[in-house]
């Protein structure tokens, strides 16, 4: 891993996704709008599966939501390494999500612990 490494995923949420999420959390959401936690879940996916990947421990996330996303709208979420702290086995990442027109939907930062990430994938290894 090095500063500048990134991972990205694109996703469209359907009204069925919103209904399933509403059932899971016990709260009704406007069916045409994607709830913010579903957008944030894209970052969790990227961090746990792609970069740094399996073994990553999510410590902190700060996200600023700049606009709403409607069902059926394509979004692209991205995480990018902004700082490595190999002495503490920590990685700082920037997090962004854009809509199909390239407009910024969210911006934020994440902090993850990578001590349990397989050797060879850790910073400085």
Residue ranges and their predicted role:
Residues 1-56, 60, 119-125:
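Hot-dog-fold acyl-thioester-processing enzymes
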Residues 2-3, 71-74, 78-125:
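HotDog/MaoC-like acyl-thioester-processing domains
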Residues 25, 67, 81-83:
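Short, well-ordered turn and helix-capping elements at secondary-structure junctions
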Residues 10, 66, 113-115:
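A structural detector for beta-sheet-dominated domains
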């Amino acid at each position: 891993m090095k500063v500048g490494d990134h991972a990205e995923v694109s996703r469209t949420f359907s009204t069925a996704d919103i209904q399933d999420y509403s059932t899971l959390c016990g709260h009704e959401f406007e069916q045409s709008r994607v709830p913010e936690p579903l957008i944030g879940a894209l970052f969790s996916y990227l961090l746990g599966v792609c970069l740094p990947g399996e073994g990553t421990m999510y410590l902190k996330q700060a996200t600023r939501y700049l606009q709403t996303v409607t069902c059926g709208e394509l979004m692209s979420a991205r995480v990018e390494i902004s700082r490595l702290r190999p002495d503490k086995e920590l990685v700082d990442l920037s997090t962004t999500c854009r809509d199909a027109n390239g407009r910024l939907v969210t911006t934020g930062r994440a902090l993850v612990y990578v001590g349990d990430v397989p050797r060879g994938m850790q910073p400085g290894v």
